[in-house]
A protein has these predicted regions:
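Structured, solvent-exposed acidic/aromatic patches
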Residues: 1-189, 201-209, 233-235
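Structural recognition of the beta-strand scaffold that forms the well-ordered cores
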Residues: 102-104, 190-193, 239, 249
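Active-site-proximal region of nucleotide-activated glycan assembly enzymes
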Residues: 196
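Extended hydrophobic-aromatic, low-complexity segments
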Residues: 199-201, 205-212, 226-228, 250
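Long, intrinsically disordered, low-complexity segments
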Residues: 114-117, 128-129, 136-141, 230-281
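Active/binding-pocket-proximal capping segment
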Residues: 192, 207-223
Length: 281
C-alpha cells in the first residue's frame, strides 16, 4: 500500500498541448459527418466540429495566425458536409437539425433537460446596454422594435403551453425530450466570429478579412441592418465582441471567456462590467 500523492497541477502550456492533441486525433479519425441510423446528426461531433473547436482553443491561446487559418478552413469546407449559415431564429426552431449547428448534445431525462434549465433565462443589464448601443432608436421590450432582432427575438417568443413569453432560443415545452433538449455547444456562426477576431488581432491587411467574416455572419442573421465598413479600425475588435455577445446570448456562456481574453489583452476593463471582480488570478 502506498499513500496517495498529490500530483502537480499541469501548467497552462501542458494543458493546451493535451487539449490540442485530443482535437488533432479527432480531426484525423472522426467522420466528416456523424451519422445516426444512417442519417446525418448534429448531436454528435465530427471532423468539422473538432476543427472548429481547435480554432477556438487557438484563439484562446493567442495563436491568432493558426486560429484564423483553421477557422477559415472550416468556413470554406463546411458546406461540403451540409453545414451553413441560416436565418437566425430558424436555428432554434430546427434545433440540432439546423445546418448552422456544428455540435448540439442533448439529454433525455426530464430532470436534466436543458430546456427546463434555460428556457426562462433572461437578459442582463449589460446585454441590454450592448443592444441599446447597437440601435440608437429607443427600444420597446414589448414589441422588440428598436432592438437588434438577435436580442429581441429570444425574449419575445410566446410559450406554446401558457402563451406567456419565454426564451425564444428554447421554444418548446419543458416536458418534451429528444430534439427539444438541444444545447447549443458550437455553431458555424461562432466560427465566423472566431475568424474575424483572429484576423483583426493581426491588424494591417488582415482587417479586410475580419470585416468580411463579420459582415457575412451579420448578413445571414440580421440581413440589411449593419454595414461593417463604417466601423473604424480601432473599434473593430470591440464590435466583433459585442456582435458575438448578442448572437450567442443564452447559449454556451462564451461571452465570459471573451471578456477575460479581451481584458488580458488590455482591450476591456472587465471591472466596469463585473465590479465584484477583485483579481485576475
Amino acid at each position: 500500500y502506498r499513500e496517495p500523492l498529490a500530483k502537480a497541477r499541469s501548467t497552462v502550456a501542458e494543458s493546451y498541448k493535451f487539449i490540442e492533441s485530443d482535437l488533432d486525433s479527432a480531426i484525423l479519425y472522426a467522420p466528416d459527418m456523424p451519422m445516426s441510423n444512417y442519417t446525418p446528426t448534429h448531436a454528435q461531433a465530427g471532423k468539422t466540429t473538432a476543427q472548429a473547436l481547435k480554432a477556438k482553443v487557438l484563439l484562446s491561446k493567442g495563436d491568432y495566425v493558426n486560429a484564423a487559418l483553421l477557422a477559415d478552413e472550416v468556413i470554406q469546407t463546411a458546406g461540403n458536409y451540409g453545414y451553413g449559415l441560416v436565418d437566425f431564429m430558424s436555428i432554434f426552431s430546427d434545433m440540432f437539425d439546423s445546418p448552422e449547428v456544428l455540435f448540439a448534445p442533448y439529454v433525455s431525462n426530464y430532470e436534466e433537460q436543458c430546456s427546463f434549465i434555460l428556457d426562462r433565462t433572461t437578459y442582463s443589464s449589460y446585454s441590454q446596454k450592448i443592444a441599446d448601443a447597437m440601435d440608437p432608436t429607443p427600444g420597446n421590450k414589448e414589441t422588440g422594435e428598436g432592438y437588434d432582432p438577435r436580442f429581441a427575438a429570444p425574449f419575445l417568443t410566446p410559450d406554446v403551453i401558457t402563451t406567456s413569453f419565454k426564451n425564444g432560443k428554447y421554444p418548446h415545452s419543458t416536458n418534451d425530450d429528444g430534439k427539444s433538449n438541444t444545447y447549443y455547444f458550437l455553431r458555424l456562426g461562432e466560427v465566423y466570429y472566431i475568424h474575424a477576431e483572429a484576423e483583426a488581432r493581426q491588424g494591417g491587411n488582415h482587417l479586410a478579412a475580419a470585416r468580411t467574416s463579420l459582415q457575412t455572419v451579420l448578413d445571414a442573421h440580421v440581413p440589411g441592418v449593419y454595414d461593417v465598413s463604417t466601423i473604424p479600425d480601432n473599434q473593430l475588435l470591440e464590435m466583433i465582441r459585442q456582435h458575438k455577445w448578442i448572437d450567442l446570448l443564452f447559449e454556451n456562456q462564451e461571452e465570459w471567456y471573451d471578456m477575460i481574453r479581451y481584458y488580458k489583452h488590455g482591450d476591456l476593463d472587465i471591472t466596469t462590467i463585473r465590479p465584484n471582480i477583485k483579481s485576475d488570478k
